[in-house]
Amino acid sequence: MKIFQNTKNVIVSIAWAAALCTSAVSAQTLTSNSTGTNNGFYYTFWKDSGDASMTLLSGGRYQSSWNSSTNNWVGGKGWNPGSSSRVISYSGYYGVDSSQNSYLALYGWTRSPLIEYYVIESYGSYNPASCSGGTDYGSFQSDGATYNVRRCQRVNQPSIDGNQTFYQYFSVRNPKKGFGNISGTITFANHANFWATKGLNLGNHNYQVLATEGYQSRGSSDITVSQGGSSGGGNSSSSSSASGGGSKIIVVRARGTAGGESITLRVGNTNVATWTLTTTMTNYTATTSASGGSLVQYTNDSGNRDVQVDYISVNGSIRQSEDQTYNTGVYQNGSCGGGNGRSEWLHCNGAIGYGDI
């Protein structure tokens, strides 16, 4: 619940301003400390001062906004009680930049022992793995990334049981997710199990939320959280050459910005599957025995259409889009495919390459 480093630059979140123009009938805006349930999800909102606010929307969606008048705040939606075996998916907008002291994280508490834990997906100016006086416990692989683990101690600080002395556990994603449009999956069992091998045990779960946090900074977020990864969705078609009980299960996690965008999964010289995207980040699954270079190709760019591909997985092994250097559809350096790739985005007809399978 606590961040320790000061920042003071200002950002303008265009996406947040646009979101404010669309009102939701069920919206409830919080400006004072509160916990409860909303549309089937638990929520928490806490601040120690200032103008931070959080708006509860349908399902697992919430929006937040804060400025430098707020010393420290944290809020989000999720579940109470939490679970060590939960798989969490999230998507939306994280409106900060590298000068702002903020986290986007799976955040929760346990009792007996009293533990505050974070799985940090993205952060701004301050890396929590550098917390003063902490102990490093190595790293492990999960959900297509490396997570660095650190334990810190908080002495006589706010907790779910008032001011207490307790440990914090951090898993910090490397590479961290970017800013702006964002999505991902957190397999929390991988974190809880690794922590336990290092003697970092959790207790009885209290709440567990996908949280935004800020400290003496300015920003906004618009986040939707759900349990597990969705599958199917949209319209799909598979080529005959990809059917017949192939040996590889490939999942493409993607969405369109307008809906109706078309993507094709290619392996070698085979069109394995073609899907028509919705605006919801969705897992699209295909089975194939084809081998060779793999790519996801965007084929019907027009108007305000863009495609965001979070990752592909091959038999459960995730390959993140932002780790790939082959991307001919992202708009960089003034042209489509004009940069070094390493992006989830296809702004133009083009493809992201994911290597041989």
Swiss-Prot record:
GO BP, one annotated term: xylan catabolic process
Gene Ontology CC terms: extracellular region
GO molecular function (one): endo-1,4-beta-xylanase activity
Pathway info: Glycan degradation; xylan degradation
Residues of the active site: 116 (nucleophile), 213 (proton donor)
Reactions listed under catalytic activity: Endohydrolysis of (1->4)-beta-D-xylosidic linkages in xylans
InterPro entries in UniProt: CBM60_xylan-bd, ConA-like_dom_sf, GH11/12, GH11_AS_1, GH11_dom, Glyco_hydro_11
EC top class named in words: hydrolase
SUPFAM superfamilies: Concanavalin A-like lectins/glucanases
Record has Cell division as a keyword: no
A Pfam short name: CBM60
Subcellular location: Secreted
Stretches assigned to the GH11 domain: 29-226
Signal peptide (from-to): 1-27
Assigned EC number: 3.2.1.8
Region listing for Disordered, in residue ranges: 220-245
Inducers of expression: Induced when the bacterium is cultured on xylan or beta-glucan but not on medium containing mannan. Is repressed by glucose. Transcription of xyn11B occurs later than transcription of xyn11A. Is expressed at maximum level in mid-log phase, and its transcription persists into the late exponential and early stationary phases.
Domain of life: Bacteria
PANTHER family: ENDO-1,4-BETA-XYLANASE A-RELATED (PTHR46828:SF2)
Family assignment from sequence similarity: Belongs to the glycosyl hydrolase 11 (cellulase G) family.
Functional summary from the UniProt entry: Endo-acting xylanase which specifically cleaves internal linkages on the xylan backbone, releasing xylooligosaccharides. Is able to hydrolyze glucuronoxylan and the arabinoxylan from wheat.
Identification of the protein by name: Endo-1,4-beta-xylanase Xyn11B
Organism of provenance: Cellvibrio japonicus (Pseudomonas fluorescens subsp. cellulosa)
